[in-house]
Amino acid sequence: MASINLIKSLKLYKEKIWSFDFSQGILATGSTDRKIKLVSVKYDDFTLIDVLDETAHKKAIRSVAWRPHTSLLAAGSFDSTVSIWAKEESADRTFEMDLLAIIEGHENEVKGVAWSNDGYYLATCSRDKSVWIWETDESGEEYECISVLQEHSQDVKHVIWHPSEALLASSSYDDTVRIWKDYDDDWECVAVLNGHEGTVWSSDFDKTEGVFRLCSGSDDSTVRVWKYMGDDEDDQQEWVCEAILPDVHKRQVYNVAWGFNGLIASVGADGVLAVYEEVDGEWKVFAKRALCHGVYEINVVKWLELNGKTILATGGDDGIVNFWSLEKAA
């Protein structure tokens, strides 16, 4: 089994870290204290470079997401709004971001934000049981709601887009994952993934080109892998649970991340960071580490590319971001 080794620990907040996202060497983080902090992650340098205006939101920052291949950032808040931030061009080359727009529409806390792979759709989800899809242009200044999806029966915790297709997954307190697709400018639920016995906190798509698989993490302490069977009938897709990953977690699984390296990472309330590998069609534990944030719960995990290596980042209730390397056993 491989080992998980701490590279760097950054104390960013006094309160819990809910979310972060990585793009172009910058890690954006969101916390209960309403602040969005940006960290430069390059070589052996992990430096706080900006703190965005906390007056933009009245409550916690629950989710952050970079627009693909740009310096545009979306942040969803418990105050029911979404803020859009853009990098300011400065003569002294300092990294600063300005508030570009505030998006309103949800009736309750915004739990998740996610950009489509082309950057022209922004999905948001909320405690109001709905998923909204917003359309924007290249500037990212104006947003039009083109669809409100209301088929979940409970709080929607998370949204994620397929890495290459206009396919959206939403995870909910109603114990399901729903798959959404655009048919003739009308977004429809094309599949309901049933199997978890508790809240589904997050999901993530396989990054392999041309592959349609999804992993999900739940209150029932399991991580599941789902596969699209390629059969559409009456605008419906068949997805099946392909695997339940090895039993590592003893409490809720809050976040899962499927890396470009094919590995799946999961974190949760038990403070364990687990990494899984698929070998000849069977999923095995590749590495695991307990107490990654001491006694605190872990809310988010991401794969990052650093110096040509793939590393992991985790964020917890302790307000700390930890960076980890994976080392295979000799």
Curated annotation (Swiss-Prot):
Q: Which GO terms describe its cellular component?
A: cytoplasm; cytosol; cytosolic [4Fe-4S] assembly targeting complex; nucleus
Where is this protein chiefly located? cytoplasm
- Name the Pfam families for this protein: WD40
Variant or mutagenesis effect after changing R127E? Impaired in cytosolic Fe/S protein assembly
Q: Where in the cell is it found?
A: Cytoplasm; Nucleus
Q: Does the keyword Aminoacyl-tRNA synthetase apply?
A: no
* Something else known: Present with 5640 molecules/cell in log phase SD medium.
Q: Which family does it belong to?
A: Belongs to the WD repeat CIA1 family.
Q: How does it assemble?
A: Interacts with NAR1.
Full protein name: Cytosolic iron-sulfur protein assembly protein 1
UniProt organism field:
Saccharomyces cerevisiae (strain ATCC 204508 / S288c)
Instruction: Quote the gene name from the UniProt entry.
Output: CIA1
